[in-house]
């Protein structure tokens, strides 16, 4: 089916507009800097010595400055959560743009990697040219101490060279540890290496303080390429033949021939030798604002998370899932948000994000998370909270909470699922443990659904193991019964899909009788499901929310952009596992 431009603009329009603006800024900055160092009269002599390497190194540096400043803004998660929840961002389309903060962070990171490669390659050429093209006439312009000096000395004995090598090493560690395989299998490595960005920014501020590249300051008394007759003062000579015979070098573009020569057959002689000065470091102007903002937020988050929570209970669920319920004074959160957990007994520095499956309300202060036991951190954390003999049992006695290790939380932080209650119709699709963001929304509806705009919720949950449905089977049954008792049976449409049939009889029973008729074997037929939703919600805007594997996300994303004959628009929102 053809793409609906109305749906495409709703889902992709603002994102692509922002991408175009960001890309234009990079291209404009690169090209403007390239022309400055290629044609600017103040860099005439430096360009003669270094050539194209000078232009590429400085142009790539300007792009690096821009992206090294922008990459920090998406990481100000407390600020983003505040903007999302405040009335200062009333537009839902603008709030949805905040969901792309992680994608923008990755885009800036990839750009930094690419242009760092260009920058390094250009400076390797510059180091060679500094050595080979050593200038006897303009000694202060040289970075090398003598002609044919080993270029490696410039790399390892100068401040820009040494800090540049260190930054390349740090960046390489951050890149390799950011791959999907390492993030999933060993999150510790990703966490520790990513915090090296503090070292990277310290090296960056030192990197620009070397002063190796210099520009000419006295253009008025020494135009680039002017004739010097070794006299103490300037004079005009009526010998145009002298100019054509002794001065073969053309004037650089952007700097015209002296009017005395072009109009009166006279040429201006140099009044003095050129003077050079190191470029003023500009990197700190780019990064100081975002870096200070980020550091201020980290300080605020440290103060906010400095008090440990009180663990109320710990439960072990099937398929290696653990639930923790806790309380903390003055803690508030909205459905769909997430927090980070920090347990010093497991790791002194690591913080791991988990979606809230239960939010505090006005009547109860308890909140909770569900953890899938994947990786060494969650395994060690489970072993601390649940003794081996109790890992397969139900809720632990409250009296044991005094033996729990100290646990600190940071947050809450915003996520796309906060918008699910702001649509009149929402479609929530979960794959496996991806159900956790929707659990807090279902709990909120169970508590009180009337204050929210939502009037119809389609909840689709796909699992391989039927035991996984037991994580929230009680919640789904209570929600179903609540709306039946309130004569609103069409408020929540629950569909559970099981991709494997082994042990299906284990969930069939009186306790979960309400779910039996909503349990299907196989995978959803997504196209038919979207057509059905569009048919029963003609002309409305349906919010589509997905948390699951990439294959599932791509399918729903594609269907959300397709046209339908009912005038229904699907707005796609996604959360990722990693």
From Swiss-Prot:
Tissue spec: Expressed by distal tubular cells in kidney cortex and in endothelial cells (at protein level). Widely expressed. Strongly expressed in kidney and to a lower extent in heart, adipocytes, hepatoma, endothelial cells, skeletal muscle, brain, several brain tumor cell lines and airway epithelial cells.
Swiss-Prot/TrEMBL induction comment: By 7-ketocholesterol (at protein level).
EC annotation from Swiss-Prot or TrEMBL: 1.6.3.1
Gene that this polypeptide is encoded by: NOX4
InterPro entries in alphabetical order: Cyt_b245_heavy_chain (IPR000778), FAD-bd_8 (IPR013112), FAD-bd_FR_type (IPR017927), Fe3_Rdtase_TM_dom (IPR013130), Fe_red_NAD-bd_6 (IPR013121), FNR_nucleotide-bd (IPR039261), RBOH/FRE (IPR050369), Riboflavin_synthase-like_b-brl (IPR017938)
Main location (coarse class): cytoplasm
Activity regulation, free text: Inhibited by plumbagin. Activated by phorbol 12-myristate 13-acetate (PMA). Activated by insulin. Inhibited by diphenylene iodonium.
Cofactor or coenzyme needed: heme
Name recorded for this polypeptide: NADPH oxidase 4
Gene Ontology cellular-component terms listed: endoplasmic reticulum; endoplasmic reticulum membrane; focal adhesion; membrane; mitochondrion; NADPH oxidase complex; nucleolus; nucleus
Ranges where the Ferric oxidoreductase domain occurs: 58-303
All ranges on the Extracellular side of the membrane: 38-62, 125-154, 210-424
Ranges where the FAD-binding FR-type domain occurs: 304-419
GO MF entry, a single one: protein tyrosine kinase binding
Membrane topology: Multi-pass membrane protein
Keyword Amino-acid biosynthesis: no
Cellular localization per UniProt: Cytoplasm; Endoplasmic reticulum membrane; Cell membrane; Cell junction, Focal adhesion
